[in-house]
């Protein structure tokens, strides 16, 4: 069953349709519910006749009065409902803030930092209920004033509609700028004058309960004034989605920048290590040439060693050569090696990425000959060069892979369903499935209900049959008892016998009357 508010709004929609029909301005009118247009543009003959009768019997004066009353009732009901609920909510929020700040006030006094002391705020001028009412009316009157302005812009030529809008409890406060409930007076004389009341008002406005109540009040007034509520809801939902997407993109950008910085640091370190290794190789090759020149006389072929034909150089003092200290070049090499090792130790260790998971060898080990070992060493040198090339290529490939756009995560089921509802409305597949489920549940409930009713009827019939049998049994029992009693008495009383015989004689007696003649 629809609620009272929805029924009254539907009635208002019908009254407005009738008014625009009489004023011949149906093109401007946009009905709140699709039922109103269907009702007044029906196809059946009987319904058409009824509606024609209804429209012909209408009068502008009566319609104006009805519209005025319905607008004022609806607006006043909404105002009263939301004022009571919002004032309670704001009062609770103020009490929560006062409890939280009671412990913070002492710390603030020590640190000399500003804090909200609600007891001092309300000690002189207002009570807590009055402050809550001021804050609620400040919010609700502002919302209603904005929507009245928006509606009056739509209806610039129609004076009757403007009078309908101003018939509510808050219209007097909006028009009368001297009243204490005017939002500008509330701001200037209450919120700004009380100490730290602006901060309190902002904190209350941030609470979700207050925001939800104000939004629902705004939407209900928009529905009364005939605005497109679904479009407003879609706008709010879109704004929330945009903020969520913006936060996601911001976090993704930060993640990408961090990855890029890490990659640049790794590349720079690898280049530095490569340069150091090249310099070390050059120094070692120079030192080897010098040593070969010094020990030319001592070197010989493998064949000479076997024959024992080695010779000594008379010009060289071998004791001096062996007792020499290491040269400057070699010391420089050691220093450079030590520095390189220290620098490597000081740098933070990073996990090397595993490029491939290679399969294990299936064959056994075979040593081979000396010639094969030499060929293997040559091959290793060749492969080492190839490996260097491969690492550079792998590095470029990794960079290209990192530049590829990352795959976006799929949206959740609820988000996708909301999008489908916006696109297809009631014809979305999940909506259709839900409707089918509801219909099946209804059918199942109907079947179960019918089965229960049939059971009850069968039970009642069986009870009635058993009761009728019991009655018949009782009757037969009573009759049998009477017969038994008469049989048990034996012979009848003589008076009864005499009476019975007299009756029998009377029945058998003949008529012996005389005819009497009158002169």
From Swiss-Prot:
Residues 321-337 have a biased composition (Acidic residues). It is found in: Nucleus. Pfam families: BUD22. Residues 338-348, 431-459, 466-497 have a biased composition (Basic and acidic residues). Keywords: Coiled coil, Nucleus, Phosphoprotein. Its main location: nucleus. Residues 407-420 have a biased composition (Basic residues). InterPro entries: Bud22/SRFB1, Bud22_dom. Residues 244-254, 267-282 have a biased composition (Polar residues). It comes from the Eukaryota. The modification Phosphothreonine is found at residues 257, 371. One of its GO terms (cellular component) is 90S preribosome. The modification Phosphoserine is found at residues 367, 375. Involved in positioning the proximal bud pole signal. Belongs to the BUD22 family. This is Bud site selection protein 22. It comes from Saccharomyces cerevisiae (strain ATCC 204508 / S288c) (Baker's yeast).
């Amino acid at each position: 069953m629809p609620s009272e508010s929805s029924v009254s709004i539907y009635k208002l929609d019908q009254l407005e349709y009738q008014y625009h029909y009489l004023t011949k301005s149906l093109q401007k009118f946009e009905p709140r519910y699709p039922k109103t247009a269907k009702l007044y543009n029906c196809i059946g003959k009987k319904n058409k006749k009824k509606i024609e009768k209804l429209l012909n019997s209408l009068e502008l004066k009566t319609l104006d009065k009805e519209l005025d009353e319905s607008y004022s009732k609806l607006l006043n009901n909404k105002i009263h409902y939301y004022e009571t609920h919002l004032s309670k909510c704001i009062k609770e929020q103020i009490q929560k803030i006062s409890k939280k700040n009671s412990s913070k006030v002492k710390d603030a006094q020590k640190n000399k930092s500003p804090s909200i002391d609600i007891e001092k705020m309300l000690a002189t001028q207002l009570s807590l209920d009055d402050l809550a009412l001021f804050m609620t009316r400040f919010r609700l009157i502002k919302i209603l004033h904005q929507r009245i302005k928006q509606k009056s812009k739509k209806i610039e030529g129609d004076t009757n509609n403007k009078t309908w809008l101003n018939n509510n409890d808050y219209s007097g406060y909006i028009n009368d700028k001297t009243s204490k409930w005017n939002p500008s007076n509330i701001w200037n004389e209450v919120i700004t004058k009380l100490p730290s009341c602006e901060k309190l008002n902002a904190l209350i406005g941030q609470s979700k309960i207050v925001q939800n109540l104000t939004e629902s009040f705004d939407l209900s007034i928009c529905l009364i004034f005939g605005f497109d509520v679904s479009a407003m809801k879609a706008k709010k939902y879109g704004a929330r989605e945009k903020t969520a997407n913006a936060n996601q993109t911001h976090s993704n950008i930060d993640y990408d920048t961090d990855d890029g910085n890490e990659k640049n640091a790794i590349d720079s370190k690898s280049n530095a290590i490569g340069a150091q290794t090249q310099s070390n190789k050059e120094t070692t090759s120079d030192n080897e040439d010098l040593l070969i020149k010094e020990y030319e006389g001592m070197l010989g072929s493998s064949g000479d060693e076997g024959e024992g034909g080695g010779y000594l150089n008379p010009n060289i003092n071998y004791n001096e050569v062996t007792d020499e200290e290491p040269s400057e070049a070699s010391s420089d090499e050691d220093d450079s090696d030590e520095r390189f090792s220290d620098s490597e130790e000081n740098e933070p260790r990073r996990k090397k990425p595993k490029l491939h998971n290679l399969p294990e060898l299936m064959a056994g080990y075979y040593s081979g000959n000396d010639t094969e070992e030499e060929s293997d060493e040559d091959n290793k040198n060749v492969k080492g060069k190839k490996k260097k090339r491969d690492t550079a290529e792998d590095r470029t490939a990794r960079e290209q892979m990192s530049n590829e756009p990352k795959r976006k995560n799929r949206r959740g089921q609820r988000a996708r369903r909301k999008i489908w509802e916006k696109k297809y409305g009631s014809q979305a597949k999940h909506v259709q499935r839900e409707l089918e489920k509801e219909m099946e549940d209804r059918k199942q409930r109907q079947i179960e209900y019918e089965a229960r009713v049939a059971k009850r009827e069968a039970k009642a019939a069986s009870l009635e049959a058993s009761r009728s049998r019991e009655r018949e049994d009782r009757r037969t029992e009573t009759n049998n008892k009477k017969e038994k009693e008469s049989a048990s008495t034996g012979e009848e009383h003589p008076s009864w016998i005499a009476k019975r015989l007299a009756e029998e004689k009377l029945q058998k007696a003949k008529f012996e009357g005389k005819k009497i003649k009158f002169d």
